[in-house]
């Protein structure tokens, strides 16, 4: 069979540690058994930047050099990266068009600014990934000093602000109203 038409290796399932780690954030909103972790680029012909992971179709694609056997056993930076990518799995499984939004809106900002009255749906798909990774680090890893969004690294009471903005998501992570751009 020509190289172009060969099936890619199927990837590996999530480890129990990875599932447990993601469950801290997403609860039962993800079908964890359906997720595969691939140690390869998603995009062909070298189009995917070397240290960039993608999760456009409900599976995780980490560059071979960055993929881990078990992200739950890694340093905080890798665990946060995993949660960021799992955010896209969560978005995909709830029906958000991750692949098309990513393709149509190249260059989406990963930055976010929390404020009273804001909620998860007010942020774009990439900002949601960073916001939920930061929440994971802050709530479960004593990792305030490592947050992606630097303005919250030394902010007293940061967790309370995160929990206020994420209240609806924390209460019902499987609700589609938490997806980017959803109206109240």
Role assignments for model-derived ranges:
Residues 28, 47-50, 61-83, 119-121:
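Short pre-active-site segment immediately N-terminal to the catalytic Zn-binding motif
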């Amino acid at each position: 069979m020509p190289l172009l038409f060969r099936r890619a290796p199927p990837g590996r399932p999530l480890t129990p540690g990875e599932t447990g780690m993601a469950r801290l954030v997403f609860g039962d909103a993800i079908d964890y058994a359906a997720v595969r972790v691939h140690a390869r680029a998603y995009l062909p012909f070298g189009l995917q930047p070397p240290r960039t992971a993608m999760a456009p179709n409900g599976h995780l694609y980490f560059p071979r050099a960055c993929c881990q056997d078990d992200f739950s056993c890694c340093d905080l930076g890798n665990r946060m990266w995993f949660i960021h990518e799992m955010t896209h799995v969560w978005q995909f499984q709830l029906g958000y068009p991750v692949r098309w939004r990513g393709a149509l809106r190249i260059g989406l900002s990963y930055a976010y600014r929390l404020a009273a009255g804001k909620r998860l749906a007010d942020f774009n798909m990439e900002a949601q990934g960073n916001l939920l990774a930061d929440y994971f680090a802050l709530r479960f890893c004593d990792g305030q000093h490592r947050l992606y969004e630097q303005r919250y690294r030394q902010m007293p009471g940061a967790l309370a602000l995160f929990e206020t903005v994420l209240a609806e998501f924390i209460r019902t992570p499987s609700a589609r109203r938490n997806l980017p751009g959803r109206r109240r």
